[in-house]
Amino acid sequence: MLQPKRTKFRKAFKGRIHGAAKGGFELNFGEFGLKAMEPERITARQIEAARRAMTRHMKRAGRVWIRIFPDVPVSKKPTEVRMGKGKGAPEFWAARVAPGRIMFELDGVPADLAREALRLAAAKLPIKTRFIQRIEE
């Protein structure tokens, strides 16, 4: 699973995702993409599950780019622990995703195969998404 090799701080504030994506909202690598339509934290496990769903459906053909990276440590206190006594230990890593952000890109496969692969990937994610395709001119 994805996670940073090292970080400046062990724990992070919860934070909020305001407004639309300020970058990463255009296709840069592939012909097809999966765009987020809602703000949400996507965990490293969800990213990995989506990646596996895509690559298995495409039968290892084509190329996949993951455009988001889980760089935010999410901490959690153990169950049945009283309030207070400090913040919990880091439990997992997440990526903050704003609406409009391209999360995955595909290339080297037909459009119908790419659409189905990204539909399967979207089923693993907790947000509404949209399939996008590069416009030929």
UniProtKB/Swiss-Prot annotation:
GO terms for molecular function: rRNA binding; structural constituent of ribosome; tRNA binding. GO terms for cellular component: cytosolic large ribosomal subunit. This is Large ribosomal subunit protein uL16. NCBIfam families: rplP_bact. Keywords: Ribonucleoprotein, Ribosomal protein, RNA-binding, rRNA-binding, tRNA-binding. Pfam families: Ribosomal_L16. The gene is rplP. Part of the 50S ribosomal subunit. It comes from Beijerinckia indica subsp. indica (strain ATCC 9039 / DSM 1715 / NCIMB 8712). Belongs to the universal ribosomal protein uL16 family. Binds 23S rRNA and is also seen to make contacts with the A and possibly P site tRNAs. GO terms for biological process: translation. InterPro entries: Ribosomal_uL16 (IPR047873), Ribosomal_uL16_bact-type (IPR000114), Ribosomal_uL16_CS (IPR020798), Ribosomal_uL16_dom (IPR016180), Ribosomal_uL16_sf (IPR036920). CDD domains: Ribosomal_L16_L10e. PROSITE patterns: RIBOSOMAL_L16_1, RIBOSOMAL_L16_2. The keyword tRNA-binding applies.
